[in-house]
Amino acid sequence: MNDTTGTLGHAIFTGLEKNEYLNEIYDALLHNDFLRLFRIDDIAQKEVDTEDALRFADLLSKSVNTEQSERHRSLAQEIITLLNALNPDDEEIQYVMGAVLSSTSNYLGLQHSVPDFQENNVLDRLSDEINRDYLRIPSQQDGYFLRSQKAVYDHMTEDDYFSYSGPTSMGKSFVMRTFIRERISPDCNFAILVPTKALINEVSKEIADNLGELLRQHDYRIITSAGAMILQEKNEHRYVFVMTPERMMYQLIGFKDIPIHYLFI
């Protein structure tokens, strides 16, 4: 691991999330947004210096060389989202929102919230275009990975075995579905292991909703039980298995000649 303790980024950003004034602004924004959401008029809003809040959001979005960089970038997006919700017609907030979402590589959010945003600086625009190309989802002109998703996807495509643990909000299921979509072919079967029976329907429905048409075009079947009748046709079709480990074990014992090319646990 590279030592970043002597870098300017480390000096600027380390401990920034503990800044008392930053947390005061953040708490005030949460308070005011709570009043807005529930239409509470008999409690006073807390005073927020919008310019200072914007500066913090912009600074946090550029966090590097610290273990808290992901947290900083997430906080930047929270602050700018709260500011925009409280001041929906403020052009300065709209611009900084675009800059924050661009700096954090949240291009999906950028398309939704500030579709016309463009960096003022030519070099920033060039950097932004390069970054977009890097994060663009295969076969999707206007779809983009988050940077953490891109790192996982690259490992999945390059490594024979890959293990990763991340928060639910990272979108691991989305990355898995993207990987499957790009590898649907006459020669590939996929297996997804889920920890409980209750998750079988949820995961298989997600696969059907997101990939159903493509799976049908390539003669795939989604299989949730080792006793499914269609398995008697053996390799007449391609398969996406969604099963618990126990069901998968019976599947492998009962149908040894149906290969599994990609396994997700």
Where are these regions (language model features)?
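N-terminal helicase ATP-binding lobe
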Residues: 1-265
